[in-house]
Design a protein with these regions (language model features):
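Short hydrophobic beta-strand motif reused across regulatory alpha/beta modules
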Residues: 1-2
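Rhodanese-like catalytic fold shared by cysteine-dependent sulfurtransferases
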Residues: 5-50, 80-85, 89, 93-107, ...
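A short, well-structured juxtamembrane/interface segment
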Residues: 49-64
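Short hydrophobic beta-strand that contains or immediately precedes a catalytic carboxylate
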Residues: 59, 69-74, 90
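Residue-level preference for short coil/turn positions at secondary-structure junctions
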Residues: 64-66, 104-105
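A mid-sequence, solvent-exposed acidic-amphipathic segment
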Residues: 70, 74-80, 84
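Structural motif
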Residues: 70, 109-111
Length: 163
């Protein structure tokens, strides 16, 4: 773990790709040994109506072709520490106010911290309720790093907003 202090706030992040790989492997081990995790997760997602999640490989191609808008709905500090390339920072708490700035002609893919993070699920629900075509990416930045996929960093205090 690494920590970055900014006044009274401390942002913690995973120290590197090796740590991310370990985290993802540990999560996979827990999932394989504790079948209840899968059952609880699937029941929760089924109740929320967001069972499907976009496939990582398909997402990479669709982003490259400009077919989707990718939203990182985590807090801005987490986005700045590392995000999927091309993703737009739009924390869940700001999503409702910014709906008019999002493109309606493209599918929106929301992601957060990983398969057990509910931020992306809530974002997809809100987007769908407001007429958007939306789905979630169940993986987060640690999953991408663990698979050797590129992650962008933005250590400035400015936020990337959708234009």
């Amino acid at each position: 773990m690494e920590a970055q202090k900014d006044g009274v706030h401390v942002t913690y992040s995973l120290a590197g790709e090796e740590v991310c790989s370990f985290f993802v492997a540990l999560r996979a081990l827990a999932e394989s040994r504790l079948l209840e995790i899968e059952q609880v997760t699937q029941q929760y997602l089924k109740e929320r109506g967001v069972m499907e999640a976009v496939d990582r490989e398909a997402l990479v191609d669709r982003v490259r072709n400009g077919e989707v808008t990718v939203l990182d709905v985590r807090p801005v500090e987490e986005y700045q520490a590392g995000h999927i390339p091309g993703a737009i920072s739009l924390p869940l708490g700001e999503l409702k106010r910014k709906l008019t700035e999002l493109p309606r002609e493209r599918e929106i893919v929301a992601y957060c911290r990983g398969p057990y993070c509910v931020l992306a699920i809530e974002a997809v629900e809100m987007l769908r309720e407001n007429g958007f075509t939306a789905t979630r990416l169940s993986e987060g930045v640690p999953d991408w790093l663990a698979r050797g996929l590129p992650v962008s960093h933005d250590y400035t205090k400015e936020r990337r907003h959708h234009k």
